[in-house]
Amino acid sequence: EYEANSSIATKEFDGEVTMVAGGKKATDVIDVMTALENKVDNFLLGGIAGELFLRAIGYEVGRDIGDMDLYDEQFVRNREKIQHMIEAHPSELVHPTDLAYEDENGERAEVTVADVRAKDHDFLDVGADTTSQYADIAANSEAVFVKGALGVFEDERFSYGTVNVLEAIAAGDCFSVVGGGDTSRAIEMY
């Protein structure tokens, strides 16, 4: 993973550099974001880190709803770095506009972030609109670094964001680096 970070940090690119910032380990993702903050043009936010950034700008996501959740703990631990990124790089942060969750019938359902009034279920993927936007940005970038999945890709219902963005990267003509075991597993699975 260090080599992946270094390959982005030490190269010069003429076009846009994009980082897909997702996964379960928000602290790791946010640390990489701050390390690469002056090299990356677009941070495509998803996973737990995406919810924490949305929480920091006032949305009702990124909060614990169960005893085993770690949102609140990770938010407190990363608040200063999140706030720094929001203040220093507001135009580079690309937030999800919709999120997916499991409805009462066990199906994938989506909601716009603006319509979330209280977090009463887990968000398990970025929504279709966000996926389309992220895939377009990634496909038009000169370099893309993927650090974490955008959703719970192990469950096919919530693999949509991760799979479609990875496919857009693969179909594009860009320098790409994948960091992290979960993202590598997603590539192997799909």
What are these regions (language model features)?
Residues 1-190:
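Active-site loop-to-helix "anion-binding N-cap" substructures in soluble metabolic enzymes
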